[in-house]
Amino acid sequence: MNAQLPDVSVSQLPCNLSPLNWVGMQHIDLPTVIDTANQTVNTKVDVYVNLPKSSVKGIHMSRLYHLINHLSVLNTMSIKSVLKQMIDSHQDCGTTAAKIVFKFDLLLKRDAIVSTALSGWKSYPVIIEASIINELFNIEYKLDISYSSTCPCSAALSRQIIKNGFKADFSSQNLIPSADIEAWLEQYATLATPHSQRSIATVVVQPFDYAHDINFVDLIDSIENTLKTPTQTAVKRADEQAFAKLNGENLMFVEDAARRLKMLLDQKYKFWSAQVVHQESLHPHDAIAVAISS
């Protein structure tokens, strides 16, 4: 039936005879299974091939869509296979390169810090970008992880205010009963509080080899364990108190967070980058630091 329908991509030459670097489609909806997380996710897919032949008006988007629509499991092998098929399906266009981008949110169940049998779901945005260019396969993984950061400078300034308040109230006493100290702290220990904020670590990694798939859960866990203050889901007061303690024990400038991630990623990946953004509560702008593998 299609043979009887006009196809201007074949019958009409382009007015401007020139090759194109990438042509394709964006935001294709696709349910996929993430092997290493044992989870089905709603994925947005971008697909591209190059168009080297200037005599060809356009690519075959329906062929690309058909190939993507049959992709059900996301792992290195399946992604590499579909990239090869994308190139093979466009030999009449002279295609030598293909690129594919997967975007999805990975949902992980997270336990409360202290409370038993209390948990909630946390979303982690993930991007997988892979390509074959001149027969060379490349793949990288990008994740966003939210955490809390408390400013060390603000903490020091807050401590000074509390210290000065304590001295002002008790400077005339040589011996201070412990009950009086407890009562004072109960009322005035928050004369000043350090500013803290939700923060985002964006990590991009490439594995040492492509024989093994990235385990997203392991990577996320290692990043959160390194930063120490991941944002929480379900909490009770005991968990909120434990979270406050974690923040107090892990005061961080953006530089501190970036260096923590550098130490972690240097040990695990060949190529990587880490960007940390602290969405300042003190300022209307953000603080940012970036570290990249050498």
Curated annotation (Swiss-Prot):
Keywords: Hydrolase. InterPro entries: GTP_cyclohydrolase_FolE2 (IPR022838), GTP_cyclohydrolase_FolE2/MptA (IPR003801). Pathway: Cofactor biosynthesis; 7,8-dihydroneopterin triphosphate biosynthesis; 7,8-dihydroneopterin triphosphate from GTP: step 1/1. One of its GO terms (molecular function) is GTP cyclohydrolase I activity. The record marks C151 as: May be catalytically important. Its EC number is 3.5.4.16. GO terms for biological process: tetrahydrofolate biosynthetic process. It holds the Pfam family GCHY-1. Belongs to the GTP cyclohydrolase IV family. This is GTP cyclohydrolase FolE2. The lineage of its organism: Bacteria, Pseudomonadati, Pseudomonadota, Gammaproteobacteria, Moraxellales. The gene is folE2.
